[in-house]
């Protein structure tokens, strides 16, 4: 009895000592423990998703792939699979399972190694949310105390739901929703028992047991899960026997991107990061953009095709690499495919290796091990590249171009395969809605994998003749008209700084003598533009350009401005052309229409300032767009008067008046009216002539009329000195687009080519806006305007139509006449007298015309 007594006393002392030690340990660790109450408001890290305007996924950003699901959305069999495998006594313990610990310890003692884990689901949750992955005794102790606290705070179902959404399951998949998508391309409710068991087996070692890494290990682990489910009575013997014999059909499933718009998606990502920091990638934001699949894909296709066409006509630069030389032992297929898999793809261009070649045909292997045939049709274009201005002879047989062992690039053209090469030239396209500035399409380069530099928004390039419509607008705002006569004869002026004569020339160097301003713009006459610049003044012209949104620091105050020496981005150019297309309003380009949080709540919605060409004052108001909504004294108080429209109004004054009126009325906010609507119509009409010309002369953009087969379009070519940059910018109903092409290396020019006869409809001669940039503009605009009814140019109030003499710009007095538009009060009043000849003085200098 005495022994029993002492034993009981010792036991009680041990228990008290143990309890005291545990309490002391708890008191020591408690200040270091995180507040588990935050679990009530825990936010799952959900990636940012970017959508098109019509709701299609175009990009996803975030390190963790997660698709949150509620417990009732998860099949019961899947829940049981996790419980059976990870914590069979989950509904019986209070965060820590002594039975499980004892069982794991016993197995470890008798087997000599730890083959069973003792962590409950609650402990795993505590570790995943609050603790580091380090394997230390202190972390394990903290894990135990946190698990107990969590059990006191949350219900079992809440713990289980949080766990099944937080657990890491390999390949950046967190939670069962993401794992179902990553491995099987399904939602959780579509999974089979086989697939559920595979996923339930992953928490122990996601990198080792996933079926994409090792199918054998995945099968073995799946069978362990099925055995545990059978032991717990969750499945029948028949289900077990059937499922364990099934194959695991797993593949990596990336997020289902409907279509790609990488340059615009990157712009969205940067904007979201600027707004929300790192949480942009974790808080489940859904961003809706302004682009649509049809329009964006048309833009990307137009740019890529045009770049490839330019690249082909300039010749083949040779194979990308030589894997083995002719006469050496060929590589085996595995070595070839491993090498090709390590190479990127660029748009339609795929890496390939030539495995055989004869005069009629070559065979090339792709990265997936398949082979394609390259006939003479697919290599005929590949005359040797010698320089940007010189190409070699057209090849006569396939082996003139291809040899066994070469690593090349190929692309599919219809049913055939063609030799290709990664282009060195690059291009950009920006398309916006001129009425509100919404970006309709944006392409920042040939391929985002090739270069992430966004030429649409970041490349400052000289604009060449693309600047002329803006400068002619300035000239007409100061008194010139579309019928004003300017002398198209050579100019020579001494440049003291350069120590030589400055002699701007037309391209081509052809001169017509006195011509009307409309023809000067339509034929892109450089000397005519210089004369107009001199007539209005360089400083006036440079300052006027700022009305179109062009930054002052990029505008030179010299006569070379007339030839486009200023540098702007394609986005800035498109914005400027929108002013001419929308009646004179400077809209702001924008590309995010709406941002939603992870619950679907709208936290941002775009409210762009819009154009209103029907309104007759610079600052408008109200929903009806009528000037009599307010009393006269209200209009005088906050609006720019009608008389002020035709004078230079500082931009801040326009903005302040606009904001004041909006604050007063709660009205739609309108974009600044930077040029009056009649003037905008005149330059819009002139851009139309740039495409369609007149009897006796052809506009530089004539190909657009041929390609689009509609007359409600207008545009302007642009080519810089030495053809280093080529542009085409213009409008159609509801759309303005600017295209640029050139080399990132500013030292290179676009050169010229000779016709080879090997390329159907090959462009030849000197590269420039009409040949190098316009084909992309034409192709894109044709696709965008397909099915859009023609909308004839309709003169706004304030425009009068007068019959003028073509050769003098005066009132017509017989034949050789055309109808011309004028702002009321600026039309000619004198009859044409042909004997006088010209209104330009003999020394080539422009007369005072106003």
Model feature map: region roles:
Residues 1-51, 89, 108-109:
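N-terminal type II signal-anchor transmembrane helix
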Residues 67-72, 389-399, 422-427, 450-470, ...:
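Short active-site loop at a secondary-structure junction
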Residues 91-101, 174-177, 236-239, 476-496, ...:
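Short, well-structured active-site flanking segments
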Residues 22, 27, 111-366, 532, ...:
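Non-catalytic, structured segments within soluble enzyme domains
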Residues 78, 289, 293-296, 300-302, ...:
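A penicillin-recognizing enzyme superfamily signal
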Residues 82-83, 229, 299, 359, ...:
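Active-site SXXK
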Residues 500-506, 537-575:
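Mid-domain, small-residue-enriched loop/turn segments at the edges of structured enzyme/sensor domains
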Residues 110-135, 186-189, 256-257, 435, ...:
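Conserved catalytic neighborhood of penicillin-recognizing serine enzymes
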């Amino acid at each position: 009895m005495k022994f029993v007594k002492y034993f009981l006393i010792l036991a009680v002392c041990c228990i008290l000592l143990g309890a005291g030690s545990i309490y002391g340990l708890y008191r020591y660790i408690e200040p270091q423990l995180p507040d588990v109450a935050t679990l009530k408001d825990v936010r799952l890290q959900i990636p940012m998703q970017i959508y098109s305007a019509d709701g299609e996924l175009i990009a996803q950003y975030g390190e963790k792939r997660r698709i949150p699901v509620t417990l009732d959305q998860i099949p019961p069999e899947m829940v049981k699979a996790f419980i059976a495998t990870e914590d069979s006594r989950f509904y019986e313990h209070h965060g820590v399972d002594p039975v499980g610990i004892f069982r794991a310890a016993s197995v470890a003692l008798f087997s000599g190694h730890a083959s069973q884990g003792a962590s409950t689901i609650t402990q795993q949750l505590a570790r995943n949310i609050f603790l580091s992955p380090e394997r230390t005794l202190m972390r394990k102790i903290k894990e135990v105390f946190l698990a107990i606290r969590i059990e006191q705070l949350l219900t079992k179902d809440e713990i289980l739901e949080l766990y099944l959404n937080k657990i890491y399951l390999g390949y950046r998949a967190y939670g069962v929703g993401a794992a179902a998508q990553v491995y099987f391309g399904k939602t959780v409710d579509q999974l089979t028992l086989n697939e559920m068991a595979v996923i339930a087996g992953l928490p122990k070692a996601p990198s080792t047991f996933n079926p994409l890494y090792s199918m054998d290990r995945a099968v073995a682990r799946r069978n362990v899960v099925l055995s545990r489910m059978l032991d717990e009575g969750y499945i029948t013997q028949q289900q077990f026997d059937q499922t364990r014999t099934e194959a695991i059909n797993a593949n990596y499933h990336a997020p289902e991107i409907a279509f790609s718009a990488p340059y615009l998606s990157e712009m969205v990502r940067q904007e979201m990061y600027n707004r929300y920091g790192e949480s942009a990638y974790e808080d489940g934001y859904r961003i809706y953009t302004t682009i649509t699949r049809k329009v964006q894909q048309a833009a990307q296709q137009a740019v890529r095709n045009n770049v490839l066409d330019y690249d082909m006509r300039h010749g083949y630069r040779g194979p990308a690499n030589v894997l083995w030389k002719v006469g050496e032992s060929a590589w085996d297929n595995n070595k070839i495919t491993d090498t090709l898999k390590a190479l990127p793809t660029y748009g339609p261009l795929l890496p390939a290796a030539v495995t055989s070649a004869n005069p009629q045909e070559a065979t090339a292997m792709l990265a997936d091990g398949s082979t394609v045939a390259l006939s003479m049709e697919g290599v005929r274009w590949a005359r040797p590249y010698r320089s940007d201005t010189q190409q070699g002879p057209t090849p006569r047989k396939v082996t003139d171009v291809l040899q066994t062992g070469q690593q090349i690039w190929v692309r599919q053209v219809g049913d055939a395969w063609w030799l290709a090469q990664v282009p060195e030239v690059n291009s950009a396209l920006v398309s916006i809605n001129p009425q509100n500035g919404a970006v309709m399409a944006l392409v920042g380069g040939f391929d985002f994998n090739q270069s992430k530099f966004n030429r649409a928004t970041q490349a400052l390039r000289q604009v060449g003749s693309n600047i002329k419509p803006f400068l002619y607008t300035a000239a007409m705002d100061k008194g010139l008209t579309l019928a004003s006569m300017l002398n198209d004869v050579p100019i020579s002026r001494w440049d003291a700084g350069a120590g030589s004569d400055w002699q701007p020339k037309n391209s081509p160097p052809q001169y017509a003598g006195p011509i009307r301003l409309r023809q000067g713009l339509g034929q892109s006459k450089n000397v005519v533009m210089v004369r107009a610049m001199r007539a209005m003044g360089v400083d006036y012209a440079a300052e006027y350009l700022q009305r179109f949104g062009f930054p002052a620091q990029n505008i030179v105050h010299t006569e070379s401005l007339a030839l486009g020496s200023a540098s702007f981005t394609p986005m800035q150019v498109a914005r400027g052309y929108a002013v001419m297309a929308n009646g004179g309003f400077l809209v702001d380009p924008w590309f995010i229409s709406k941002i939603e949080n992870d619950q679907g709540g709208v936290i941002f919605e775009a409210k762009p300032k819009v154009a209103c060409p029907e309104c007759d004052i610079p600052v408008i108001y109200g929903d009806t767009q009528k000037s009599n909504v307010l009393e006269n004294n209200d209009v005088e108080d906050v609006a720019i008067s009608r008389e002020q429209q035709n004078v230079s109004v500082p931009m801040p004054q326009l903005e302040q008046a606009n904001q004041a009126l909006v604050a007063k009325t709660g009205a739609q906010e309108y974009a600044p009216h930077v040029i009056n609507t009649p003037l905008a119509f005149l330059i819009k009409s002139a851009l139309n002539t740039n495409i369609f010309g007149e009897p006796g002369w052809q506009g530089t953009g004539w190909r657009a009329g041929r390609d689009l087969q509609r007359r409600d379009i207008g545009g302007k070519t642009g080519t810089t000195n030495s053809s280093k940059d080529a542009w085409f910018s213009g409008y159609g109903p509801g759309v303005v687009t600017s295209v640029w092409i050139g080399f990132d290396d500013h030292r290179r020019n676009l050169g010229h080519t000779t016709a080879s006869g090997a390329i159907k409809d090959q462009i030849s001669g000197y590269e420039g806006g009409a040949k190098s940039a316009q084909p992309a503009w034409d192709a894109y605009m044709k696709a965008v305007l397909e099915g859009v009814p023609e909308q004839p140019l309709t003169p706004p109030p304030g425009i009068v139509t007068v019959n003028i003499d073509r050769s003098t710009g005066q009132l017509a007095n017989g034949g050789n006449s055309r109808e011309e538009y004028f702002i009321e009060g600026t039309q000619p009043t004198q009859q044409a007298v042909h004997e006088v000849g010209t209104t330009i003085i003999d020394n080539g200098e422009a007369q005072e015309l106003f």
